[in-house]
């Protein structure tokens, strides 16, 4: 948990080189730290509506959660911020993340409270709760034992044996009748008797064959491959993905102040892309850079550090006033609480 103090601004693409040069001279960093992130915006799928009672404060609320990881494919590494992104001339294709190619990936899950309200606020102040986990994409082998249906075969064998028995009985009866009728059909009686013995042997062979089939149970192994995806983890956690975006920019450090200049990209579904690729477009087609300056304070109750951080941000605001205008963002747009109507 951190208490974050922040100011935001924007700068046109034509002033990007001038802004970078000024910040390099201010911070002394000739090579700023690159920013290349991919963010999932999630929402709880279980609706929670607390019962409001007079005289009681309901502090249990649901929040949207952001899941942030690195954007480190070939497109993200070779992207040039100094070149403008033209709508029809620039193709930005990124790799799909959840294909199971990466074995390991770090995710930072963030939930932020609404900024503090007040007329005399010099900067935006809000509490951010975050946790970082390491997720491994693994292949899980699910083996299901499927037992073959032997009952149908055994029933058929039993029916065959019954038919053999009936035939034997009929043949024996016919043999007795032939024997009692006279000597003229004695030869035919012997033939019937011989056929009865052959039928008896075939019946015993069928019986042994059916017993062998009953004793041997055929088992088949059906192997199903599934990937232990991060999306499945979010589903088990109780969250659904509702949006996603990509960020590309640079980061400067001035004392305890972090200065970020970046562009935001979203998915472009209007144009077709390859099967394993996602086409991106700028969230702001005017190629405007977003600027965010912030200081993280360990505790929201540390008044001394909060006052010192506010003074540092105001000094930076005064120093850069002729280049960029740092201001307080609208707190209502930073409210991440889930409201159900």
Swiss-Prot record:
Which compartment or compartments is the protein found in?
Nucleus
- UniProtKB keywords: Activator, Nucleus, Transcription, Transcription regulation
The family line of this record is:
Belongs to the Mediator complex subunit 18 family.
Any single Gene Ontology cellular-component annotation = core mediator complex
Instruction: Give the residue ranges for region: Disordered.
Output: 139-216
Name recorded for this polypeptide: Mediator of RNA polymerase II transcription subunit 18
**Gene Ontology annotations of biological process type:** regulation of transcription by RNA polymerase II; termination of RNA polymerase II transcription
**Entry-linked InterPro entries:** Mediator_Med18
**Where primarily located?**
nucleus
Superkingdom in the source lineage: Eukaryota
Q: Which gene encodes it?
A: SRB5
Q: Which PANTHER family match?
A: MEDIATOR OF RNA POLYMERASE II TRANSCRIPTION SUBUNIT 18, MEDIATOR OF RNA POLYMERASE II TRANSCRIPTION, SUBUNIT 18
Q: What does this protein do?
A: Component of the Mediator complex, a coactivator involved in the regulated transcription of nearly all RNA polymerase II-dependent genes. Mediator functions as a bridge to convey information from gene-specific regulatory proteins to the basal RNA polymerase II transcription machinery. Mediator is recruited to promoters by direct interactions with regulatory proteins and serves as a scaffold for the assembly of a functional preinitiation complex with RNA polymerase II and the general transcription factors.
Residue spans crossing the bilayer? none
Q: Indicate yes or no for the key word Transcription regulation.
A: yes
On assembly, the entry states: Component of the Mediator complex.
């Amino acid at each position: 948990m951190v208490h974050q103090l922040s100011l935001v601004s924007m700068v046109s693409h034509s002033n990007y080189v001038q802004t970078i040069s000024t910040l390099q001279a201010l911070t002394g960093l000739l090579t700023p730290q690159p920013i290349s992130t991919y963010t999932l915006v999630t929402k709880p799928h279980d609706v929670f509506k607390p019962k409001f009672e007079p005289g009681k404060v309901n502090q249990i609320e649901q929040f949207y959660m952001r899941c942030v990881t690195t954007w480190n494919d070939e497109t993200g590494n070779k992207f040039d911020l100094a070149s403008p992104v033209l709508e029809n001339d620039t193709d930005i294709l990124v790799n799909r993340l959840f294909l199971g190619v990466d074995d390991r990936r770090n995710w930072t899950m963030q939930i932020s409270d609404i900024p503090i309200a007040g007329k005399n606020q010099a900067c935006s102040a809000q509490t951010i709760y975050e946790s970082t986990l390491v997720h491994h994409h693994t292949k899980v082998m699910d083996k299901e034992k499927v037992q073959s249906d032997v009952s149908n075969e055994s029933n058929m064998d039993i029916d065959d044996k019954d038919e053999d028995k009936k035939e034997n009985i009929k043949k024996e009866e016919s043999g007795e009748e032939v024997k009692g009728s006279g000597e003229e059909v004695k030869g035919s009686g012997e033939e019937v008797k011989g056929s009865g013995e052959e039928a008896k042997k075939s019946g015993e062979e069928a019986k042994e064959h059916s017993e062998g089939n009953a004793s041997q149970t055929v088992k088949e192994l059906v192997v199903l491959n599934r990937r232990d995806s991060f999306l499945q983890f979010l589903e088990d956690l109780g969250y659904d993905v509702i949006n996603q975006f990509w960020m590309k920019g640079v980061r400067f450090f001035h004392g305890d102040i972090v200065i970020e200049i970046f562009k935001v990209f979203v998915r472009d579904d209007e144009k077709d892309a390859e099967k394993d690729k996602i086409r991106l477009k700028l969230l702001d087609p005017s190629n405007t850079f977003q600027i965010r300056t912030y200081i993280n304070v360990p505790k929201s109750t540390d008044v001394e550090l909060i006052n010192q951080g506010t003074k540092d941000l105001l000094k930076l605001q005064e120093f850069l006033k002729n280049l960029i205008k740092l201001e307080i963002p609208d707190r209502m747009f930073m409210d991440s609480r889930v409201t159900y109507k």
